[in-house]
Amino acid sequence: MVLPGTDGAELVEALKPSRSIRLQPDVLLQGKAQRIGDDEVILYKPRWGAFYGTPLEALLRERGIDALVFCGCNFPNCPRASIYEASERDFQIAVAADAVSGIYPQGIRELERIGVTVQETAEIVSWLTSIPHQ
């Protein structure tokens, strides 16, 4: 538990594009996005899945993003919920298996059955760097 507006609720400095950025709990707790850079936003995630009760899908769609790569902490909870939510919304999905803690063989098989590509980070990075960018 953290108290909004306190140092304990802040992002780690190394993750911020600028040291002067502070979280805006009044914005985030209303379910809105806080923009902290040209391509960076912060969202408050009220449940396990990243799409539930957040503007994530709208933010991705307005940028023309239709494919997502997932990594994360504790696969059985937040990553899995977010992956299934993304699948329900027809995003193309890849999971970096070596960058997800708690992932297990049956979970990988279940993801593959719903069309998720499961690869190692190096394979995903290699593929992404081979795509011509607009």
Give the positions of each predicted feature.
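Active-site alpha/beta core segments
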Residues: M1-R63
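Residue-level detector of anion-binding/catalytic polar loops
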Residues: D66, E88, Q92, T117
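A short glycine-rich beta-strand->turn/loop micro-motif centered on a GG-aromatic cluster
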Residues: A67-P76, Q92-P105
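Active-site-proximal loop->helix
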Residues: G102-V116
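A charged, well-structured terminal subsegment
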Residues: T117-Q134
